[in-house]
Each structure stands twice: as structure tokens, then as C-alpha cells.
Amino acid sequence: MELLAPNLRVVFCGINPGLSSAHQGYPFANGSNRFWKVVHQAGFTDTQLAPEQWQQLQDTGCGITALVARPTVAASEVTRDELLSGGEALKEKILRYQPRALAILGKQAFSSAFGVKNAAWGRQEMTIGKTEVWVLPNPSGLNRATLEQLTESYRELFLALK
């Protein structure tokens, strides 16, 4: 469940697939996950895509990947070692495809994968090649952030890429 191509505006990087996504074969497939609603409301898509339409995201200049391929019930089941090796693999992918921005969905996952302590939300000082690195809140239903808070964070990235 990866959608990568050269010259994308942004690649959204989740932590790992949930069991619903693994079973259905679509990223962010769990009904409680707000990814599709948030990327639409933030301006990345003209219409709200359903998880099964995930490949259409590339038509908007957006891609999808994950730090860890192993599906779990909750992202908290992913080990630190998996995140570290996932971070290394992600760097290689980003250097190969060079999107304008990489948006890692989760501050703790970003910190673990890239060894960054006290990461802030938003644009990071680091880049991967010429790619800007952003940290955005995870859209999982387990995240306490409101839909409005999520949309505002993603909209900041959308506006920065215009």
C-alpha cells in the first residue's frame, strides 16, 4: 500500500498499516481514521476520496507510504528498532523520488525513526535531499486531536506548498 512517484508535492507517511487496512488492501481504511476527510478539508483533494480510491491521490500530486510495513492493531505495537530501520528505508525512498515535502504522521514516530528529540509540529529544520520534512498529527481515531485541529495542521502544509 505505497504510492510513490517522482516529483510529487507531498508524500504522507503513516506509522504502519492497521489491521483494517491490511485486510482491505487500502491505506487509512479504518472507519475511525480521519485521513481522507482531513486531506480533503485541508485542500489536497477536490473531493473526499474513499480508501478504495487511494491510488487517485497521486493525481493530486500526493503519495503515501509508511515507516513500517507490518500491520498491527495499534501503532504502539511497533518497536523502536522497526521505526529506526523504517526511517532509514524512508530516507532512501525520499532521496529516490524527491517529493517537495515529506509529512510524517506522528511526532513520536518521527522522533524514534530519525533520532530527533523534542520535535515540534510542522516544518522541521532537517531535509532529505531537497525534500522538506514536516511532522503532522496522526489522523487515527485514537488521536485526541479534533478534526478541526488536524485540518488546520494539514492546511498549513498545503498552503506552504502552493
Swiss-Prot record:
Its EC number is 3.2.2.28. The keyword DNA-binding applies. InterPro entries: MUG/TDG (IPR015637), MUG_bact (IPR023502), Uracil-DNA_glycosylase-like (IPR005122), Uracil-DNA_glycosylase-like_sf (IPR036895). Keywords: Cytoplasm, DNA damage, DNA excision, DNA repair, DNA-binding, Hydrolase. Signal peptide: none annotated. Transmembrane segments: none annotated. GO terms for molecular function: DNA binding; pyrimidine-specific mismatch base pair DNA N-glycosylase activity; uracil DNA N-glycosylase activity. GO terms for biological process: base-excision repair, AP site formation. It is found in: Cytoplasm. Pfam families: UDG. GO terms for cellular component: cytoplasm. It catalyses: Specifically hydrolyzes mismatched double-stranded DNA and polynucleotides, releasing free uracil. Its main location: cytoplasm. Belongs to the uracil-DNA glycosylase (UDG) superfamily. TDG/mug family. Binds DNA as a monomer. Excises ethenocytosine and uracil, which can arise by alkylation or deamination of cytosine, respectively, from the corresponding mispairs with guanine in ds-DNA. It is capable of hydrolyzing the carbon-nitrogen bond between the sugar-phosphate backbone of the DNA and the mispaired base. The complementary strand guanine functions in substrate recognition. Required for DNA damage lesion repair in stationary-phase cells. This is G/U mismatch-specific DNA glycosylase. The gene is mug.
